[in-house]
Amino acid sequence: MSDFKKILVANRGEIAIRIMRAANEMGKATVAVYAEEDKLGLHRFKADEAYRIGEGMGPVAAYLSIDEIIRVAKESGADAIHPGYGLLSENPDLVDACVANGITFIGPRAETMRALGDKASARRVAIEADVPVIPATEVLGDDFDAITKEAAEIGYPLMLKASWGGGGRGMRPINGPKELKEKVLEGRREAEAAFGNGEGYLEKMIIRARHVEVQILGDKQGNIYHLYERDCSVQRRNQKVVERAPAPYLSEAQREELCELGRKICAHVNYECAGTVEFLMDMDDGKFYFIEVNPRVQVEHTVTEEVTGIDIVQAQIMIAEGKSLSEATGKASQYDIRLNGHALQTRVTTEDPQNNFIPDYGRITAYRSATGMGIRLDGGTAYAGGVITRYYDSLLTKVTAWAPTPEKAIARMDRALREFRVRGVSTNIAFVENLLKHPTFLNNQYTTKFIDET
C-alpha cells in the first residue's frame, strides 16, 4: 500500500487540529469539513483545504452525514479519512462507505468495530477472550416485566449504559426498582438523541470503583502492542475531568495484569489501529472488570504520548498505510516501550461551576494560555475573538502536564492553570485548581464518585 498524500479529517475542533498537525509533520496535505454554524472554527483554517458540508442539515447532523463526508473526500482527492473521536468515529457504515469508494479509513475494520463498538457485543468478545466482566443483562427489550426481573437477578444498585457511544450519555444510576422504568426510558431518549441508537443494558454497579484503561495499537500483520494504562477515575457525572498516565496507585504486578487483559481482548479480534480497552477496578479487592473497547483515538491520548514518546495519531496513519508496529512506533517490540515520568490532562471548558456547570456561550474577549516546560496545549476555538456557540461541546482546550513524578506533574499543572486568563465566557479553571489540591486526589484515594460526592 502506498503512503497517503491527502487526508480528510471528518471531525472538528481540537481533535481535527491535532490530526492535521500529525499529518503536516508527515508531509501530508489535509482537508477539513465544516458546518455553516462552525465556519469560524480554527480547524477550517488549519487545513490545506476546507469544504462546507451539510447545507440545511443542522450543526451536528452535517458532521454525521456519511454521504457528505464521502462527497468531499472524492471532490478533494483525499485518499484516506481520519474520523477523530465522537461523531462518526465509531460508525462502521463510514468504514463500509470508504471501502466502497476506494478510500482508506484510518481506524479498525468495520467487522471489528461492529464487534467492539457495541458494548453488549464487546462483552461477549471479552468473555470469549477469558477477560472478567461485570454482571450485566443483554440489550434491553421493551418488556418492562422482563427488565424488572433481570434487574432483580443481578441486584441493585445498577447502571444503565448505552450500547453505542460514550461520554456519559445514556448512562443512569438506578438504586432500586421504583426508579427502573423512568431511568431506562430517560437514558434511551438521551442515547437516541446523542448516537441515533437508544439501545442499552443494565450492569451491576461497583460502589468503590476506579476507571482505568489500556491503550492498544495493532497492525495489519497481526501484532499488538499496549502503551500501558491511563487512570480516568476523576469524573463528573460520568464525564472524565482529569486523566493520568500511568495510574499512580497500581503495583507493577497489577499494571502487568491489566495491560495483558487489554492486549488479550484486542488480540482475540485481530485488532488494527489504535483502540482503548476500559476497565473498572474494584478498590476493595483490586480486581479488574472489562467495561468496553473504544475503537478510536481517545480525548486523553495525550498523556500516553507524553509518557511513552509515541505519537498515537501518526501511528494510526502509518498502520493504515500498511506499516508494521515497529515502523509506526519506532519500537522493535513491546519490551522496548518504557514509561517515562508522569502526565496528567485537564480539560478547560466553558462550563460555569457556580451555575451547575451549565455551558456558557459568547465571544472570548481576552485569552492568554499557559506555556513553559512540560506543558502541552491541544485547543480548538481558544483565542481572543473566538465565538463559543451552543451547538457544540464546551471544550476550550486540553492542558497536559508532564514531569518526572506525579507530585511534580500536579504542581506543574496547577502552575499552568493559574497562568490562564479567559474573559467573555465562564470556565471551569478554578474548579479544576481546587480539585488538584484536594487531599483525596493527592493521596490517590479517589473513586469515580469523588467529585459527585465531594
Predicted features, each with a name:
Residues S2-D3, L8-M26, T30, A50-R52, ...:
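ATP-dependent carboxylate activation and anion-phosphoryl transfer catalytic cores
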Residues A136-T137:
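Conserved beta3 strand of the protein kinase N-lobe
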